[in-house]
Amino acid sequence: MKGRILILSLLIMSLVMAQVQVEAKICCPSNQARNGYSVCRIRFSKGRCMQVSGCQNSDTCPRGWVNAILENSADATNEHCKLGCETSVCGAMNTLQNSDASEIVNGASEQCAKGCSIFCTKSYVVPPGPPKLL
């Protein structure tokens, strides 16, 4: 039974992480342009690097521009959480929980909510017990 909960938890976390990929992409016309953009971003602004590399900021890349870079945007992540990670990711599970109050479904639903909380707050889970001294 614990194995099922673990598998469901991993599935839920992968669904949560997949939600991040709805944000804008930096689309580049070639590998060379993408690499140039990535190196440029170490020191310069996004706008400057797009201008120099020929890349574009877009939700969808133009045909043939398959070299997309997903931007890690805290605003997009926070917005997703504000809109309701639990509603969008755990909604089907909550419906199942309402129709079948089994222990596995209840546990998976709790894990989903916990995963959303950790994801949205960028927290980590502290293991139980006293801290170990190095």
Curated annotation (Swiss-Prot):
Q: Do you know which PROSITE patterns this protein is assigned to?
A: THIONIN
Q: Name one Pfam family in it.
A: Thionin
Q: What triggers expression?
A: Highly induced in seedlings by pathogens, wounding, silver nitrate, and methyl jasmonate.
| The protein, known as | Thionin-2.1
Role summary: Seems to function as a defense factor. Thionins are small plant proteins which are toxic to animal cells. They seem to exert their toxic effect at the level of the cell membrane. Their precise function is not known.
* UniProt tissue specificity: Detected in rosette leaves and at a very high level in flowers and in siliques.
Chief location category: secreted
Q: Does the keyword Manganese apply?
A: no
Q: Does the keyword Cell inner membrane apply?
A: no
Q: Where is the signal peptide?
A: 1-24
InterPro entries, alphabetized: Thionin, Thionin-like_sf
Molecular function GO labels: toxin activity
Tell me one GO biological process term. Answer: defense response
Alphabetical UniProt keywords? Disulfide bond, Plant defense, Secreted, Signal, Toxin
Which GO CC terms are listed, alphabetically?
Answer: extracellular region
**Taxonomic superkingdom:** Eukaryota
What family is this protein classified in?
Belongs to the plant thionin (TC 1.C.44) family.
Which residue numbers fall in the propeptide? 68-134
> Which cysteine-cysteine pairs are annotated as disulfide bonds in the entry?
C27-C61, C28-C55, C40-C49
Q: Where in the cell is it found?
A: Secreted
